[in-house]
Amino acid sequence: MQIQSFYHSASLKTQEAFKSLQKTLYNGMQILSGQGKAPAKAPDARPEIIVLREPGATWGNYLQHQKASNHSLHNLYNLQRDLLTVAATVLGKQDPVLTSMANQMELAKVKADRPATKQEEAAAKALKKNLIELIAARTQQQDGLPAKEAHRFAAVAFRDAQVKQLNNQPWQTIKNTLTHNGHHYTNTQLPAAEMKIGAKDIFPSAYEGKGVCSWDTKNIHHANNLWMSTVSVHEDGKDKTLFCGIRHGVLSPYHEKDPLLRHVGAENKAKEVLTAALFSKPELLNKALAGEAVSLKLVSVGLLTASNIFGKEGTMVEDQMRAWQSLTQPGKMIHLKIRNKDGDLQTVKIKPDVAAFNVGVNELALKLGFGLKASDSYNAEALHQLLGNDLRPEARPGGWVGEWLAQYPDNYEVVNTLARQIKDIWKNNQHHKDGGEPYKLAQRLAMLAHEIDAVPAWNCKSGKDRTGMMDSEIKREIISLHQTHMLSAPGSLPDSGGQKIFQKVLLNSGNLEIQKQNTGGAGNKVMKNLSPEVLNLSYQKRVGDENIWQSVKGISSLITS
């Protein structure tokens, strides 16, 4: 199909929008033609496409003048293809501009992958903006809207279509394995859609194999990005669970403007997290389904920065804490509807007890001190629930931990050590600084929860980046503990062996897949290089390998919400 063939039927503004889009896409991706051999597959790159600009140009001559990035061009192609699909749902699948572009992209495919150039990277980042401008130009042409109103409509329409596409794709269990020192570990991420007793998922408003992505910020019916995360080891001929917890996005439907709906939505999300927590405890779930009123302890660890200076996360934390408080009044029994093995909805009775923390882990919190005071006002109360009123490091633990230790369990030493470490961190405000370990308090709270048979749950705003790094830090320490029978000291960088474990976990924990599930591209936004360098957190030192660091970062910097 010739691009020129549809120019005559488009308005001048539509033509201008398309020309800009065409230039961005084609100049960025460089359509392949003429002579030359495609380069070999880039190390650790995940497959996709390639291209050139001028007839007769060859890869060798072209690449000599281009600075390569760390991103696979194939990954950029997949991202752009998905964005074109979203635009097509807004403009119509037969839109000539998008059809032509899609055809050109198909023609551009070659078998081998290579690192993208900086120009191609910039083009991929700009594509979404240009597609929205194209939609705005079409809207302005067809409906006669003012430019600003047309652009606002286009941005909302594109976002809604993208959220729908991400939600409606299959949400399936992610399972990866890694081996270290002869031990075989399995990391499993189970989405809400696959939390099943029978043929259907357990939730009253069924997911039906789909999900709720992190960008669905007005959803008041489901928790965002809800998964059960597990790490197990295969030994003595069977699989042994080393850790299990629930991960999700913030409970606040923060783009819902109606205060009442926002409150109802936060409670609904909290109920889904409690339902998932109950599902993670099969024996407790069976008792509840048999009609028994069961007590459910949950340690919720928010990872947001409790400040409204940037991003309004302070209000989101308030919404989340209010939801937990409304469901966990002393002695309060709540009723949850769960779909049983026959597919019927059944009411179960639970007495939820939630120790609700919030620990800022980004640069705003750990480098600039934003939100620390607000977070610690919640954390003090939650620590008293967990460890008792005497938080001196040398004091005997009380609270939930004291009750657990009174049984003299097999994991007495691990529980006691974790409790002491948490008290030390709290006393010295170590969680207010990076100190070589941004997640030092959050990670230990989750581990301690699991060790005392409570359910750990953790979340950031989206449930994918900070939440994903928390997931990886937990699994790194869990595997290290299994290997060495020792807990790391708070604020310590992993040694070479610990770094090897961390590297394997980062690439095989399922977090890259969850990020792609939510945005269309794999990569963790917490991996960044800021200027001045003093603002950077300690991830590069903790990971210990630049290539792994770049792989974990992925194409996150090219994705805009």
Curated annotation (Swiss-Prot):
Belongs to the phosphatase IpgD/SopB family. This is Inositol phosphate phosphatase SopB. InterPro entries: IpgD/SopB. GO terms for biological process: negative regulation of cell growth; negative regulation of signaling; positive regulation of DNA replication; regulation of protein kinase activity; symbiont-mediated perturbation of host vacuole organization; symbiont-mediated suppression of host reactive oxygen species generation; symbiont-mediated suppression of host TRAF-mediated signal transduction. Contains the consensus sequence Cys-X(5)-Arg characteristic of Mg-independent phosphatases. One of its GO terms (cellular component) is cell periphery. Converts phosphatidylinositol 3,4,5-trisphosphate (PtdIns 3,4,5-P3) to PtdIns 3-P and prevents the transition of PtdIns 3-P to PtdIns 3,5-P2. It is one of the known effectors injected by Salmonella into the host cell and is required for invasion and for an efficient generation and maintenance of Salmonella-containing vacuole (SVC). Alteration of the phosphoinositide composition of the plasma membrane causes membrane ruffling and actin cytoskeleton rearrangements.
